[in-house]
Regions:
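Receiver (REC) domain active-site loop signature in two-component systems and cognate sites
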Residues: 66
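Short acidic/polar segment at the start of the alpha1 helix of CheY-like receiver
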Residues: 21-25, 98
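Short amphipathic alpha-helix used as the core "switch/output" element in two-component signaling
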Residues: 50, 72-85
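Helix N-cap/capping motif at the beta->alpha junctions
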Residues: 41-50, 71
Length: 128
């Protein structure tokens, strides 16, 4: 089953990974790139917002517990800005607190197939 990446306009879907753990970002990058996605990384919410201003992704994955700006504030800021409010958000966190404004959530540790399936569904639902 090919769950990836190509949007309706033929462009490769872009995913922004926001997580303070380098190993998690690395693992997610490998999974997404192997499936054909373009990946950008940020180590906290503030860096994620800066990255989004430079180039808007088709999907954002974020942790909840991070320094500088946690995932909940990050999501709140995305949702309150008309330019970013509709970006699908996948929370990937070991924290059981569910970000209400996120589209869906996966726990850590996660299965690569579940991660790819959730990403593909969110990108597809967004019209990608």
């Amino acid at each position: 089953m090919d769950e990836r990446k190509i949007q309706g306009d033929g462009a490769i879907a872009r995913i922004l990974i926001v997580d303070d753990e380098p190993d998690i970002r690395f693992m997610m990058r490998l999974i997404f790139e192997a499936a054909g996605y373009q990946v950008t990384e940020a180590r906290h919410g503030a860096a994620g917002l800066k990255s989004i201003k430079a180039r808007q992704p088709d999907l954002v994955t974020t942790d909840v517990m991070m320094p500088m700006m946690d995932g909940l504030e990050f999501i709140e800021r995305l949702r309150s800005d008309p330019e970013t409010a509709m970006i699908p958000i996948l929370v990937v966190s070991g924290n059981s607190e569910l970000a209400v404004a996120a589209n869906t959530r996966l726990g850590k540790p996660f299965d690569a197939r579940d991660l790819l399936h959730a990403a593909a569904l969110l990108i597809r639902e967004d019209g990608g």
